[in-house]
Amino acid sequence: MSGHDRDCPASRRYAQGTSDTGGRAIYRLVLWNIDLTLVDVVRVSREAYAEAFRRVTGRPLVALPQLAGRSDSEIFFESLALNDVPSQRSSEGGQDMLARYIWELQVAFAARRELLTRNGRLLPGALEAAAATAGLPGALQSVVTGSIRPNAAEKLTAFGLAGYFDLDIGGYGADPYPRGSQLLRSVTAAQEKYRAPVAATVYLADSNRDVEAARIAGVRCIAIASGRSTVTDLRAAGADVVLTDLTDTAQVVEAADRLTAVPAAR
């Protein structure tokens, strides 16, 4: 348990693999992106991408595509194209290149676990915001992220965030679905796991692609200009609320509460 988790009752709310909510009624879902929304571990991620790519293709990763709003699966195929590597089935065990890459990426990232806090950082206000939104009445929290699930868990655990999210109902980078579909699948997963109707959902993220995915899925979006997209970009993309960062916890909570308010449940 990290020092962040030790004194936070909310961090013990989600026991992965169970549907225990402590007797709370669930009626709204708060979903978060991870990279450049909650944490910045780009340096470690790039190193892991390069190692996994080399192990699968036998070639160095010379060119890496833009990462914002993209899944690890998308990044792999775009990297193949950028580096002139043909996409084909591996001769080893009949596993395709993507399956091998996902495995190698997990291994490469786990090997760099100790570097996450050394070469990465928790973004300002992220811990407080995640803790506060987890405490909203009727709220259930998870992540919809481009990272594969093991790596998402590594990132959240390293910075004391993991306990605020039910990772079982999240959307991850190995899933063969666009981000908008992942958001909808998380809503369905939450309803099935907790046997409760989710009346409203909000997605907190940092890129234009994330905002567009939320609009496609029909969920509300709080965009945080902590990544590559500017406040102007995020507003133009159609975010319901745009924040410069997460440092004003009350502002984050007010926006999440307002966008997921269900009159009959308040």
Name what the model sees in each region.
Residues 37, 49, 126-159, 172-177:
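Substrate-recognition element of Asp-dependent hydrolases with the DxDx(T/V) motif
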